[in-house]
Amino acid sequence: MSEPIQNENVESNVADAADIAAATAATEEFTNTIGDAIATASEEETIEAAPVVLDGPIQTVGRRKRAIVRVRLVAGSGEFKCNGRTLEEYFPNKLHQQLIKAPLVLLDRENQFDIVATLKGGGPTGQAGAFRLAIARALNAYNPAERGELKKAGFLTRDARAVERKKAGLHKARRAPQYSKR
């Protein structure tokens, strides 16, 4: 009585092996076809974009939390104007100043551009983060070939974190009223 069951198992194992072999062959064929398409696409990408000639100001926008910063990047000597004031006056905290200048320092362009910024909303940290994003976007527009460096450092990534809204029945966004068992 046990022999018919063994024969059925052997037949199903043979069928499974045939299915696996067919699937593997189909996968290899698909990979080879896609690989050819990817190879031609990557060959096109190796052509680097030439830097844009700065004939006018580059204008970009950066956002972080509730802050919005509009930046105008023009050829100059490395001067910053934030709502009509210098960077040191507007951001007295050295950490915020370093955060803002980071994209320029990374690409070694600290004294190549003058930056005029309009900052609205949020607090100093949010404004500094938005300012950094706007500067990075402007540098990317100036020379798209340097996009990889900016992206790798995380300067072109918009930080999507924002304050979570308060929910009904809770004290804050997640703080629930104290629980009493009895």
Curated annotation (Swiss-Prot):
It comes from the Bacteria. SUPFAM superfamilies: Ribosomal protein S5 domain 2-like. Keywords: Ribonucleoprotein, Ribosomal protein. One of its GO terms (biological process) is translation. One of its GO terms (molecular function) is structural constituent of ribosome. Gene3D superfamilies: 3.30.230.10. The keyword Ribosomal protein applies. Pfam families: Ribosomal_S9 (PF00380). The keyword Membrane does not apply. PROSITE patterns: RIBOSOMAL_S9. InterPro entries: Ribosomal_Su5_D2-typ_SF, Ribosomal_uS9, Ribosomal_uS9_bac/plastid, Ribosomal_uS9_CS, Ribsml_uS5_D2-typ_fold_subgr. GO terms for cellular component: cytoplasm; small ribosomal subunit. Belongs to the universal ribosomal protein uS9 family. This is Small ribosomal subunit protein uS9. It comes from Corynebacterium glutamicum (strain ATCC 13032 / DSM 20300 / JCM 1318 / BCRC 11384 / CCUG 27702 / LMG 3730 / NBRC 12168 / NCIMB 10025 / NRRL B-2784 / 534).
